[in-house]
């Protein structure tokens, strides 16, 4: 899994605008969020089975 910054898109938080990041796993976007959210997702999913991680991709579409 790798975290990739999307330079042309941003996320509006309560007090500021931050760049959008995505987590890519096996050429599939499995999570969209801020950089800390994406790193947290990678941390919690590092020992999860591949099928479970790819199932997350279906939830964001």
Please describe what each predicted stretch is:
Residues 1-22, 47, 51-61:
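Short N-terminal "domain-start" leader segments
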Residues 19, 27-28:
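Beta-strand-connecting loop/turn residues
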Residues 24-25, 31-56:
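A short, charged, amphipathic alpha-helix used as a generic interaction element across diverse proteins
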């Amino acid at each position: 899994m790798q975290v990739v910054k999307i330079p042309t898109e941003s996320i509006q938080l309560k007090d500021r605008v931050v760049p959008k990041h995505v987590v890519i796993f096996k050429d599939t976007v499995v999570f969209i969020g801020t950089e800390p959210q994406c790193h947290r997702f990678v941390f919690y999913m590092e020992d999860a089975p591949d099928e479970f991680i790819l199932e997350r991709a279906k939830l964001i579409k």
